[in-house]
Amino acid sequence: MRRLEGSMVAIVTPMKDGAVDLRALRELAEWQLAEGTDGIVPCGTTGEGVTLTPAERADVIRTVIETVRGRALVIAGAGSNATHEAIESVKLAKTLGADAALVVTPYYNKPTQEGLFRHYQAIWEATRFPVVAYNVPSRTSVDLLPETVARLAKAGAIAGIKEATANMDRQVQLVEKVGKDAIAYLSGDDFTVLPYVACGGHGVISVIANIAPRAMKELVVAARSGDLAGALAKQAAMAELNRMMFVETNPGPVKAAVALLGRSGGELRLPLAPVSEASLAKVRDAMVRFGLKLA
């Protein structure tokens, strides 16, 4: 298995007139590769995976894999709050040739820690494919605790975790209970890349990399190489732009930002609505101040 590390983009899913725009997706993926991105993660939260049909998800993942052609990691979004559906999604990712699958904790039905353990264990037993668990309690109302992560790692059921709690004490606990390099630790928060890496993280699955991939790659490289001053300067420079990516619900602002770069339309799928004019102005101003060239 390839090492799951570096600067990865939670890539948006371009849409046009209500349909997935695969041509624009290919162009975005090629641009990411040219900018040095280490991995592409299609069909995640930012990629609106939950509102894609099964056929659309397959098309998106296949398009990314065919475009990348082994030049970067592909970690396919494959989560569900039904274990049997998650298993089928992971099987699809495996069949299509992804490097791993990103599997969010089951949402809405609020399983216990034992339920979470059995969920990921069942996926591993049915697929024998590398899974990155995705812990984002702010969206799922479920928190995958370090003790459970340690059980899963010991059982070989997960290859990594995308941790989106923005809690550095949590990352310290994970390293303590699971082991420094036992699994891949990937930040799910662009705001905390530097401290996350300093606490044992191996990289990030990033939203802002959709519009500033080279800047995010440089931040990750600086943080991982121990260039504290350089990494701190890069993290601080991104702060406002990071905040504006969440001025409304993700991926609304980042899709609007991608459109402002002229790289695809900013169309969203319901129930997500376009960002307001006021929010769009904030996003545009932050992009200009960061030095991005608008279309």
From Swiss-Prot:
Q: Which top EC class applies here?
A: lyase
- Transmembrane residues, as ranges? none
List ligand-binding residues for pyruvate: 46, 205
Q: Where is the active site?
A: 134, 162
Give the source's domain of life in one word.
Bacteria
Q: Name one GO molecular function term.
A: 4-hydroxy-tetrahydrodipicolinate synthase activity
Give GO BP annotations, semicolon-separated: diaminopimelate biosynthetic process; lysine biosynthetic process via diaminopimelate
Q: Which reaction does it catalyse?
A: L-aspartate 4-semialdehyde + pyruvate = (2S,4S)-4-hydroxy-2,3,4,5-tetrahydrodipicolinate + H2O + H(+)
Q: Which InterPro entries match?
A: Aldolase_TIM, DapA, DapA-like, Schiff_base-form_aldolases_AS, Schiff_base-form_aldolases_CS
Query: What EC number(s) does its UniProt record assign?
Result: 4.3.3.7
| Sorted UniProt keywords | Amino-acid biosynthesis, Cytoplasm, Diaminopimelate biosynthesis, Lyase, Lysine biosynthesis, Schiff base
- Specify one Pfam family: DHDPS
- Localization terms from the record: Cytoplasm
Say where the protein is mainly found.
Answer: cytoplasm
Subunit structure and binding partners: Homotetramer; dimer of dimers.
What family does the entry list?
A: Belongs to the DapA family.
By what name is this protein known?
4-hydroxy-tetrahydrodipicolinate synthase
Instruction: Name the source organism.
Output: Anaeromyxobacter sp. (strain K)
